[in-house]
């Protein structure tokens, strides 16, 4: 318990307590994966303690039915007579190790591997038999009686992947891939396409190969011995779900069932560090990395190369964008990844000409050389040439001082520039020729619409087109084919384009974002940017600094393989789809996610299926690596089991990607129809196929508990700026669509359904550092419990914080008591508090003020995404509010914007969530 006294605001507390509705607690959807959490020991589960090997000395016995099943699988796996795959006995791996390594006299062999008093692997039991596998169970609920919906479900893990320990060589928590790396929409896979089609549930994978901006945070285990074992036929990598056969001399692939030879090197260990094959990372860990040998490398891993293409036209200078960019670069030169000290830098300034800079070595300064920093202007935009290419892309280490010197001079050089033109297209081509030999990143910082040379864009006429069927074709399409065709050239030479667009004017984000979409980059949009607003500078500088300091890998390709019957069919995210199943990333960022759609092409005959994602990459430390992510999933012929194992967050991500594609290629109306139809189809199928009896009229709206947030997420998605009907500036809508198609899952969910916190009555410990059980203080701040995103829970005197992942809104109720206003803002008059994009002032001797600022800082603290949320302070309506207050118009706009994030409410022409459910109920009852 906290010893901090809770500040009580009498009027607010009494009224809030009378009207508050306690949050509903989510039902326990499935048995916990951790036996300890269920009050069971690993021995009771038939599992060894964590970190221990499988039980040893117990050969695996098969029933006649099991032997027949293995024979059928073997015979179907190959038509090659000389492989002798059928009738191969399955042998327990520890039995093999016991035969190979004799125990020392008087000492038991590996005491930690002695058999536990548990079921012997391979012998079916009531819980683990072929026909009685443990599976997730359905928990039916009525959506209409669960209002407001229990939003704590949004933070629950997905339904467990129920894989018995005998299916793993070394059972442990890391033997199957964590949902942080890969999540399947279905954690029980239909055995045939007809069942999948009947379910109306999508089958897809949400993949995030990297979890942090910086690779030194929680890296997966690495194999450095150069031994990479792969299946001869399907080319899958050895993983925790293969089986050793023929006394361990061969291994059976869990993807295609082929028997492969085991390399002798697997059992050759360092005498000073003896290990068995079961200690190898590929056997123990579903997520791991290999140091790639030469055969995986076409050329020496290239140096990380950054080409900064900076807008120096009049608009960029006036807005303060140029000065902000240069200052941020100056402060973060040492943060740019340079692990192998080969990182190279180039800087181009662009207006109606391209300004190159020749940067000499720092050593030349010390030797009295006359070689100086020179600027070379190229005005021929049709065929721009490179005046001195060898001295314009320079080593960050060898030229560090001169790069800094150049950056300090650039604002002075262009401070009086009156040119309004910005030749982005020719500048991109010049940068392409400059770094095309090795590849790298082109980072564009622009405050002006490209209006000169190839790729010239014009302002589109939005009047009469916004919120019509023509919006996609005329406002969200690419205005000039250059921005798509150029990405093809970039992909061939391993170049990524990132965009930082900051302007008070139209930027045509819809056209420009194609540069990053197809080169594995990102588009960052800062509407209304002004260097006079410190909050704009902080947001841009923070995100730009985190972006250029983020670790990256070059020359990257990613492929997902499925076991027999599974095939990857569609791919969503920012990359170049080089072939039918190969996704190419010139550079792979650390803050994006990807979605692959999976088809069940043929009937799956096995009880378990597998997905393996392989990422081949070059790191900034001159290493070529392969990251492997392996996922095992049970299969089923039961529609109820499919529904019981559906992952509502992954399904929401799937339909989000589909809707973004539909909005960009067809129309926003079709995207909204797709979103709503996804809910209707699932509800109708559940009612028809799962519910035992149907009653007319007052029938409940049934769904399983693990999917009860799905209708809420889809309804909220239709109110997102990317999809909602109404007048939305095309730049804002295009930027919103761009964000949705690449956000990691947890931030996507927050973007769709914002977190809302009540601050005026938060718990005593909220806003204070978290304390461990030992009483030690951590850097993590305790957050209040979130509320449902509806104004019906807002009190007129309360203080609320809304976090949608992009912005923070601090809503101060118009009738808040003076004590609360003073504790937060240091003034008792609510009409004196700052409004709009502001920061909360520091109020001395106010613990409550400190706690509120701590919460805001905690919400902004990310090590896996570069976003920094600006804070908007909103004053709620009040009967005592002056009619002609100076900020009345701004306040009204802010209230409308903040209210649009309360997605359970009726917003403009969109119905409330309760009304949405009633509409769905009426549709499926027809």
Curated annotation (Swiss-Prot):
Zn(2+) binds at residues 231, 234, 253, 256. GO terms for biological process: COPII-coated vesicle cargo loading; intracellular protein transport. Pfam families: Gelsolin (PF00626), Sec23_BS (PF08033), Sec23_helical (PF04815), Sec23_trunk (PF04811), zf-Sec23_Sec24 (PF04810). Keywords: Cytoplasm, Cytoplasmic vesicle, Endoplasmic reticulum, ER-Golgi transport, Golgi apparatus, Membrane, Metal-binding, Protein transport, Transport, Zinc. Residues 231-256 are annotated as: Zinc finger-like. GO terms for cellular component: COPII vesicle coat; endoplasmic reticulum exit site; endoplasmic reticulum membrane; Golgi membrane. It is a peripheral membrane protein. The keyword rRNA-binding does not apply. It is found in: Cytoplasm; Cytoplasmic vesicle, COPII-coated vesicle membrane; Endoplasmic reticulum membrane; Golgi apparatus membrane. Its main location: cytoplasm. InterPro entries: ADF-H/Gelsolin-like_dom_sf, Gelsolin-like_dom, Gelsolin-like_dom_sf, Sec23/24_helical_dom, Sec23/24_helical_dom_sf, Sec23/24_trunk_dom, Sec23_24_beta_S, SEC23_SEC24_subfamily. Residues 20-54 have a biased composition (Low complexity). GO terms for molecular function: SNARE binding; zinc ion binding. Residues 1-54 are annotated as: Disordered. The COPII coat is composed of at least 5 proteins: the SEC23/24 complex, the SEC13/31 complex, and the protein SAR1. Golgi apparatus membrane; Peripheral membrane protein; Cytoplasmic side. Component of the coat protein complex II (COPII) which promotes the formation of transport vesicles from the endoplasmic reticulum (ER). The coat has two main functions, the physical deformation of the endoplasmic reticulum membrane into vesicles and the selection of cargo molecules. Belongs to the SEC23/SEC24 family. SEC24 subfamily. This is Protein transport protein SEC24-2. It comes from Saccharomyces uvarum (strain ATCC 76518 / CBS 7001 / CLIB 283 / NBRC 10550 / MCYC 623 / NCYC 2669 / NRRL Y-11845). The lineage of its organism: Eukaryota, Fungi, Dikarya, Ascomycota, Saccharomycotina. The gene is SEC242.
């Amino acid at each position: 318990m906290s010893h901090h006294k809770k500040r009580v605001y009498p009027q607010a507390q009494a009224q809030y307590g009378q009207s508050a509705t306690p949050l509903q607690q989510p039902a326990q959807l499935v048995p916990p994966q951790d036996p300890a959490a269920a009050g069971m020991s690993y021995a009771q589960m038939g599992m060894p303690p964590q970190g221990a090997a499988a039980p040893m000395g117990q050969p695996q016995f098969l029933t006649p039915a099991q032997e027949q099943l293995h024979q059928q699988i073997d015979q179907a796996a190959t038509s090659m007579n000389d492989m002798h795959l059928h009738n191969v006995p399955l042998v327990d791996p520890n039995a093999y190790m016991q035969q190979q390594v004799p125990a020392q006299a008087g000492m038991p062999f590996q005491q930690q591997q002695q058999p536990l008093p548990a079921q012997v692997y391979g012998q079916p039991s009531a819980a683990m038999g072929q026909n009685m596998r443990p599976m997730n169970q359905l928990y039916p609920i009525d959506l209409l009686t669960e209002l407001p919906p229990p939003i704590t479900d949004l933070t629950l893990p997905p339904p467990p992947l129920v894989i018995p320990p005998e299916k793993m060589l070394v059972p442990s928590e890391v033997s199957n891939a964590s949902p942080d790396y890969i999540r399947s929409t279905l954690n029980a896979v239909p055995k045939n396409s007809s069942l999948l089609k009947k379910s109306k549930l999508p089958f897809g994978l949400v993949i995030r190969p990297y979890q942090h901006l910086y690779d030194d945070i929680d890296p997966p285990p690495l194999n450095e011995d150069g031994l990479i074992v792969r299946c001869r036929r399907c080319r899958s990598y050895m993983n925790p779900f293969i089986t050793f056969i023929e006394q361990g001399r061969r291994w059976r692939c869990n993807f295609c069932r082929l028997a492969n030879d085991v390399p002798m090197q697997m059992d050759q260990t360092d005498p000073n560090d003896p290990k068995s094959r079961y200690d190898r990372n590929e056997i123990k860990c579903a997520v791991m990395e290999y140091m790639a040998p030469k055969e995986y490398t076409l050329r020496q891993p290239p140096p990380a190369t950054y080409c900064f293409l900076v807008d120096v036209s009049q608009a960029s200078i006036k807005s303060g964008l140029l000065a902000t960019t240069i200052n941020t670069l100056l402060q973060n030169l040492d943060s740019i990844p340079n692990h192998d000290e080969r990182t190279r830098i180039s800087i181009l300034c662009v207006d109606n000409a391209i300004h190159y800079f020749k940067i000499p070595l720092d050593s030349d300064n010390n030797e009295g050389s006359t070689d100086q920093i020179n600027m070379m202007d190229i005005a021929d935009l049709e065929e721009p040439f490179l005046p001195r290419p060898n001295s314009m892309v320079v080593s960050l280490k060898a030229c560090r001082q001169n790069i800094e010197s150049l950056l300090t001079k650039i604002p002075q050089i262009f401070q009086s520039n009156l040119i309004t033109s910005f030749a982005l297209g020719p500048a991109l081509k010049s940068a392409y020729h400059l770094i095309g030999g090795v590849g790298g990143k082109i980072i564009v910082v622009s405050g002006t619409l490209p209006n000169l040379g190839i790729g010239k864009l014009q302002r589109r006429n939005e009047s009469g087109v916004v919120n019509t069927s023509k919006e996609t074709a005329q406002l969200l399409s690419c205005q000039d084919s250059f921005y798509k065709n150029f990405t093809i050239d970039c992909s061939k030479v391993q170049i990524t384009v990132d965009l930082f667009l900051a302007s008070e004017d139209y930027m045509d984000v819809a056209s420009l974002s194609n540069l990053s979409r197809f080169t594995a980059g990102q588009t960052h949009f800062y509407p209304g940017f002004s260097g006079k607003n410190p909050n704009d500078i902080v947001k841009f500088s923070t995100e730009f600094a985190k972006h250029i300091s983020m670790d990256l890998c070059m020359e990257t390709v990613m492929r997902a393989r499925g076991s027999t019957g599974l095939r990857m069919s569609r791919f969503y995210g920012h990359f170049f789809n080089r072939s039918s199943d190969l996704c190419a990333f010139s550079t792979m960022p650390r803050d994006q996610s990807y979605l692959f759609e999976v088809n069940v092409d043929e009937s799956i005959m096995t009880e378990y299926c597998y997905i393996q994602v392989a990422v081949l990459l070059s790191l900034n430390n001159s290493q070529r690596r392969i990251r492997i992510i392996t996922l095992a999933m049970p299969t089923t012929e039961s529609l109820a089991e499919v529904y019981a194992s559906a992952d509502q967050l992954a399904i929401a991500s799937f339909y989000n990607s589909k809707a973004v594609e539909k909005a960009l290629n067809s129309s926003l109306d079709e995207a909204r129809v797709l979103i709503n139809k996804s809910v209707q189809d699932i509800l109708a199928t559940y009612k028809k196929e799962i519910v035992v009896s149907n009653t007319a009229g007052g029938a409940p709206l049934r769904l399983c508990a693990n999917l009860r947030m799905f209708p809420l997420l889809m309804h909220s998605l239709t109110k997102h700026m990317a999809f909602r009907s109404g007048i939305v500036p095309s730049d804002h809508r295009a930027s919103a669509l761009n964000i949705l198609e690449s956000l990691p899952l947890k931030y996507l969910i927050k973007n769709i359904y914002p977190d809302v916190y009540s601050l005026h009555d938060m718990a005593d410990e909220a806003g204070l550092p978290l304390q461990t059980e030992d009483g030690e203080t951590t850097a993590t701040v305790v957050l209040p419990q979130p509320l449902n995103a509806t104004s019906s829970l807002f009190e007129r005197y309360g203080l609320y914080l809304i976090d949608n992942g992009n912005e923070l809104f601090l809503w101060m109720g118009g009738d808040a008591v003076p004590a609360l206003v003073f504790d937060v803002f240091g003034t008792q008059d609510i009409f004196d508090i700052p409004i709009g994009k502001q920061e909360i002032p520091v109020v001395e001797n106010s613990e409550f003020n400190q706690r509120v600022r701590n919460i805001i800082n905690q919400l902004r603290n990310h090590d896996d995404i570069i976003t920094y949320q600006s804070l908007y302070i909103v004053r709620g309506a009040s009967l005592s509010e002056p009619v002609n207050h100076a900020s009345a118009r701004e306040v009204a706009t802010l209230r409308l914007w903040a209210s649009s994030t309360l997605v359970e409410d009726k917003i403009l022409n969109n119905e409330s969530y309760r009304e949405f459910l009633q509409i769905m109920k009426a549709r499926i009852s027809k």
